[in-house]
């Protein structure tokens, strides 16, 4: 493996990222990310791979509700109604990332990596993968109170799998 800025990531996660980037390059699919609880870790992981500039279009780190609204076009009313950690918000984040980029495929992550707030459980994470043709996949995971780092690494595996599924159609 080449030297990366994420030495704490397990080798299998880095290997999955390399495989995904090769698949995206082969299919000429450009990717955008919209991350909340992972704080840009997916974008960092993808851009650690040599040649990522050919397929990684951009990444949004929208940790706050305000950022989700300002950068991705979500409405505060939807966040208030559904909760920032919900299927609806994850799907809207993915759609907003596509709308605000030139990418073909978006992956959004929103969840509780550490202790949950008043409206959720530790380790609850929602993922959405949206394609330009309108196809969207959602995945809800209940990872439990594993701690921020462990939850974020688990999120990388799930996100890479969803991106692969999105590329393959």
Predicted regions and their residues:
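Short alpha-helical segments enriched in small residues
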Residues: 1-169
């Amino acid at each position: 493996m080449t030297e990366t800025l994420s030495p704490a990531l397990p080798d299998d996660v880095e290997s999955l990222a390399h495989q995904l980037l090769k698949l995206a390059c082969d299919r000429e699919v450009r990717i955008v990310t919209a991350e909340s609880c992972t704080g840009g870790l997916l974008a960092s992981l993808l851009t650690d791979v040599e040649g990522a500039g050919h397929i990684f279009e951009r990444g949004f780190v929208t940790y706050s509700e305000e950022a989700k609204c300002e950068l991705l076009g979500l409405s505060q009313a939807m966040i208030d109604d559904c909760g920032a950690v919900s299927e609806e918000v994850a799907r809207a984040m993915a759609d907003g990332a596509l709308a605000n980029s030139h990418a073909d495929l978006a992956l959004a992550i929103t969840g509780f990596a550490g202790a949950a707030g008043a409206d959720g459980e530790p380790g609850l994470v929602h993922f959405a993968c949206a394609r330009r043709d309108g196809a969207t996949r959602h995945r809800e995971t209940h990872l439990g109170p594993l701690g921020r780092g462990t939850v974020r690494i688990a999120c990388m595996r799930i996100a890479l799998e969803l991106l692969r599924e999105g590329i393959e159609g």
